[in-house]
Amino acid sequence: GRRPCCNECGICDRSLDPMCICEDLVPQCHEGCQACEEVDTGTPMYQCRSFEYYHCGTPCL
């Protein structure tokens, strides 16, 4: 499948093709996110807390 975009990747593992945690707050988690958490910022936003493959540094449109 296609990798989701992520403006700001947080922790990544050290593998050759790293899996990362994306720090972005999004209206809904991407398909395939293993651990989606709701973050209360006044409006319901979500953050994917599992290690996933992302295109890091790619703005999500």
Swiss-Prot record:
Tissue expression pattern: Expressed in bulb (at protein level).
UniProt superkingdom: Eukaryota
Cellular component terms (Gene Ontology): extracellular region
UniProt record similarity statement: Belongs to the Bowman-Birk serine protease inhibitor family.
Residue pairs linked by disulfide bridges in the UniProt entry: C5-C60, C6-C22, C9-C56, C12-C20, C29-C36, C33-C48
Organism, as annotated: Hyacinthus orientalis (Common hyacinth)
A Pfam family: Bowman-Birk_leg
Protein name according to UniProt: Bowman-Birk type proteinase inhibitor B5
Source taxonomy: Eukaryota, Viridiplantae, Streptophyta, Embryophyta, Tracheophyta
Site-annotated residues for Reactive bond for trypsin: R14, S15
Biological role: Serine protease inhibitor. Inhibits trypsin (Ki = 41 nM) and weakly inhibits chymotrypsin (Ki = 410 nM). Does not inhibit bacterial subtilisin.
One of the record's GO molecular function terms: serine-type endopeptidase inhibitor activity
Biological processes annotated in GO: negative regulation of endopeptidase activity
UniProt keyword terms in alphabetical order: Disulfide bond, Protease inhibitor, Serine protease inhibitor
